[in-house]
């Protein structure tokens, strides 16, 4: 490979994409700088020289955000980037998923792919630049990678598909789709949509694949020009004689164990066979390498038999038909003090989701590279070890938990009511209590139930289902509602969430080459049937969102004030608004357009805070009459409070009909008197009169007396 800088360019969605090689990070096995518009991402690939002594492929993909890319200095005391943001973790997963299947079985060398985002143009996706850069860094390196791959973002505006939409176009789009794959096949899909039909989603995927083919042809030109020769790597293989011996000893018993229907009983039966075989070789004092190979052979026996049963004999591990969904059970309102709760059980998968409603001030603040500054809807997913009957350390959420939480959020967001219709922040937490596959989709179903229980006026209920595929030669079977073993040993994990009208989220990972459009179409239609079945079950438990919120949920009232008066409500250094909050115990959020949201669980305090704010922003008009309290007495008159925050002056000459010698002769501090606004001067000072009202009253009495005499 040449060490001189070389530059390659292509047009991508009307913006130039440039790849630079041979200048940066030259000690990595492969490195490229991808410029897309003003976005710049450095992608590198490195690999260990020797294979690691592990039974899996040790691949790490990191997408690293740097705040200098958008001209920001990190917040906090340390002033440097800390742990990766959720967006960065999701981007890392997005790049990992299409790359991972393209390494040979038995490849055990450690591989690390790192993309550093160095400059961001919001209209030119840094994730897509990083995906292309990661593929290219591997492809031009000597690492045995069977790529390249590429990715594209697809939107739809007014019925027309758009590649890599700009920020403005994304706001108008009803599809947000990321598709990745090789020139021959798609192997990764990640999508959110606004209840879009399955047929349209399929067309969008195919539209994206056409662009992928063009980007791969571009990469192949670069590899031809600067690529290194691939290194010869010894792949991990089991000994042929050992393979035959283990199979003769275990195959028949293992086949019987696999067909035990109940998950734990099946696992116990399989483990019993494994234990017997391992003990046999331990008795022969086999070394660690041999025992490792024995485990590998036993795993392959299980995998091959499960796949054969599904594709040829059409038998699933738990005895279901291909399109059959496990038994469903749901319940709502099981936690009294929470704002809403939903328990969803599907076979041996169970999720308990809790909905919490908060004020708009409870939104999540985002300090990242994107244009979004906050979000008012959150879905968090927890996967404790007891859900699979295991013990392990309890730590914070990992990549998997964050990814599963994100697909739930994406699936539910299109049906969340607008801030105008429902001025609340909504947080969902899904606790996985039992797991045997499809937990992310169970969390979507549980979360829908929880929000309906909480009284969130959803546009439509959402359900999710995980589809699978097992393909052997010409034989294939599409599976509805896959369980853990089918996910692990199958060729596809295809999660589909949506309403009765259409899809709201898709996530697909494919482990094989050449998935045809027909299989995809069949999987989507089979998923729709399953989704509608699950929705009907959920609606039998709670047909519509509750009409009233929980007694423990905050009550929110909305009012509008003149934007020029916002500073009066806040006061110098927040003094006024803090006083209201301290006095009433409410939360107050003020938008720039003058919309004010007041929230607390006490409606009486909400009303009190609203009255105080109304008084602060109220405009005094000449001619208005007030019951005013005397606050201060001076020689020249009395200062009175018309309402909270607004005072006026009753001059001594306006206190009474007769001449007043001393103000104290008429009023004292604390008295309440009726006054009329007679003037507001240029400086905004309010002049009041008591005398005018007394005179008007005197004249009314005189007229009344006159009328009385005439009647006599």
From Swiss-Prot:
Keywords: Cytoplasm, Magnesium, Metal-binding, Nucleotidyltransferase, RNA-binding, Transferase. One of its GO terms (cellular component) is cytosol. GO terms for biological process: mRNA catabolic process; RNA catabolic process; RNA processing. Residues 623-691 form the S1 motif domain. GO terms for molecular function: 3'-5'-RNA exonuclease activity; magnesium ion binding; polyribonucleotide nucleotidyltransferase activity; RNA binding. The keyword Acetylation does not apply. The keyword Metal-binding applies. Its main location: cytoplasm. Pfam families: KH_1 (PF00013), PNPase (PF03726), RNase_PH (PF01138), RNase_PH_C (PF03725), S1 (PF00575). It comes from the Bacteria. It is an enzyme of class 2 (transferase). This is Polyribonucleotide nucleotidyltransferase. It comes from Bacillus cereus (strain ATCC 14579 / DSM 31 / CCUG 7414 / JCM 2152 / NBRC 15305 / NCIMB 9373 / NCTC 2599 / NRRL B-3711).
């Amino acid at each position: 490979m040449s060490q001189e800088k070389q530059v390659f360019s292509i047009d991508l969605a009307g913006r130039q994409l440039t790849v630079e090689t041979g200048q940066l990070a030259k000690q990595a096995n492969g490195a490229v700088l991808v410029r897309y518009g003003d976005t710049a991402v450095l992608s590198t690939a490195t690999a260990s020289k020797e294979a690691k002594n592990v039974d899996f492929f040790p691949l790490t993909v990191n997408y690293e955000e740097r705040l200098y890319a958008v001209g920001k200095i990190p917040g906090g005391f340390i002033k440097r980037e800390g742990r990766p943001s959720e967006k960065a973790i999701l981007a890392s997963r997005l790049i990992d998923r299409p790359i991972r299947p393209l390494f040979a079985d038995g490849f055990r060398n450690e591989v690390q792919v790192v993309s550093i985002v160095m400059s961001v143009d919001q209209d030119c996706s840094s994730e897509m630049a990083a995906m292309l850069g990661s593929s290219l860094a591997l492809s031009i390196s000597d690492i045995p990678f069977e790529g390249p791959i590429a990715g594209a973002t697809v939107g739809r505006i007014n019925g027309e598909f758009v590649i890599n939409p700009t920020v403005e176009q994304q706001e108008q789009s009803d599809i947000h789709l990321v598709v990745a794959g090789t020139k021959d096949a798609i192997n990764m899909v990640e999508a959110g949509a606004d209840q879009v039909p399955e047929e349209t989603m399929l067309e969008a995927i195919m539209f994206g694949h056409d662009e992928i083919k063009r980007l791969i042809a571009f990469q192949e030109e670069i590899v031809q020009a600067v690529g290194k020769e691939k290194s010869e790597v010894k792949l991990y293989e089991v000994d042929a004689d050992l393979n035959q011996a283990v199979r003769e000893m275990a195959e028949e018993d293992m086949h019987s164990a696999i067909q035990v229907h109940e998950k734990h009983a099946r696992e116990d039966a399989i483990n019993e066979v494994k234990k017997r075989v391992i003990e046999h070789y331990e008795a022969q004092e086999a070394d660690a390498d041999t025992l490792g190979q024995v485990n590998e052979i036993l795993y392959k026996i299980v995998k091959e038999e499960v796949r054969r049963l599904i594709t040829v004999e059409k038998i699933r591990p738990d005895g279901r038909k291909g399109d059959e969904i496990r038994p469903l059970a749901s319940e709502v309102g099981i936690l009294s003090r929470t704002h809403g709760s939903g328990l969803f059980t599907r076979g041996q998968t169970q999720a308990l989701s809790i909905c919490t409603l908060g004020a708009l001030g409870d939104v999540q603040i985002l300090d990242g590279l994107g244009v979004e500054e906050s979000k008012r809807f959150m879905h968090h997913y927890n996967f404790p070890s007891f859900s699979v009957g295991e013990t392990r350390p309890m730590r914070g959420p990992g990549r998997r938990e964050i990814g599963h939480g994100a697909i739930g959020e994406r699936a539910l967001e299109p049906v969340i009511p607008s801030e105008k219709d429902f001025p609340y922040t909504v947080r969902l937490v899904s606790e996985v209590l039992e797991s045997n596959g499809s937990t992310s989709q169970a969390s979507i179903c549980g979360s829908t139930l929880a929000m309906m229980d909480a009284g969130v006026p959803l546009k439509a209920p959402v359900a999710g289902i995980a589809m699978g595929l097992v393909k052997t030669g010409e034989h294939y079977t599409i599976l509805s509602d896959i369980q853990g073993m089918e996910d692990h040993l199958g060729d596809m994990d295809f999660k589909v969430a949506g309403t009765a009208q259409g899809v709201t989220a898709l996530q697909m990972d494919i482990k094989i080459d050449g998935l045809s459009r027909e299989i995809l179409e069949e999987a989507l239609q089979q998923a729709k049937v399953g989704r509608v079945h699950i929705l009907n079950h959920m609606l039998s438990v709670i047909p519509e969102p509750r009409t009233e919120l929980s007694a423990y949920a905050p009550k929110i009232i909305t009012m509008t004030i003149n934007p020029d008066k916002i500073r009066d409500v806040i006061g110098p250094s927040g003094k006024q608004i803090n006083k209201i909050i301290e006095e009433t115990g409410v939360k107050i959020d003020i938008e720039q357009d003058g919309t004010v949201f007041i929230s607390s669980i006490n409606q009486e305090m909400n009303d009190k805070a609203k009255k105080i704010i109304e008084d602060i922003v109220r405009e005094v008009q000449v001619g208005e009459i007030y019951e005013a309290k005397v606050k201060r007495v001076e020689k020249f008159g009395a200062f009175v409070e018309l309402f909270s925050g607004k005072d006026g002056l009753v001059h001594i000459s306006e206190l009474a009909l007769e001449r007043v010698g001393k103000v104290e002769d008429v009023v004292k501090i604390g008295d309440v008197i009726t006054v009329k606004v007679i003037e507001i001067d240029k400086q905004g000072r309010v002049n009041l009169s008591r005398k005018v009202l007394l005179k008007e009253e005197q004249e009314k009495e005189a007229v009344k007396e006159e009328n009385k005499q005439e009647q006599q």
